[in-house]
Amino acid sequence: MTVEGVADRRTAPSARYQPVLGTLGFVWDQAADQVLLIHRTRRADGKHNGLGGKLEPDEDIVTGMARELHEEAAIVPTDMRLRGTISWPGFEGPDGDDWFGFLFLITRWTGEIPDSNDEGELSWVPRSRLMAWCDPATRSDSGLDLHEGDVHFLPLLFDDDPRPFHALMPWEQGRPTGWSVTRV
């Protein structure tokens, strides 16, 4: 299958898709209907995002997500569900590093969440504000700055469909160039 914007980058017959494996988790306080976001002020683009990062060689995705939650928010998840996966070819870096992410929704945890960490500031955002960012008509009113492609998957994280989603979102020159998703 050829995906626009991806095939052009891989002209060498020996080129293989060997993405960075990562986790991305959204901590949801259901009682308050708020989602924990980090404003990654350490990075030049300073985006708001869920918590997560690269898997270590000795980790499975659950262990890696739990480690990232502890490192970034000082919490231990007690209810964590894999909601989906996304392949992000060309996502990050000057050469467009490929990423493959495992997306989690965390609804119970132990620990006290600090106001910040080495990556940036942590804050609780009403889920309605996060969903407002996903709507082009209300995006500017949300006061959030997320990655442009997040508009596609954020609603899937919080919907009632129990099936995980599996998506492809190619990137080129710092912007998403496509989106396809399947649920099984």
Regions found by a protein language model. Give the residues of each.
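Short, charged/polar surface micro-motifs in flexible loops or helix N-caps
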Residues: A32, R43-A44, W88, T107-E112, ...
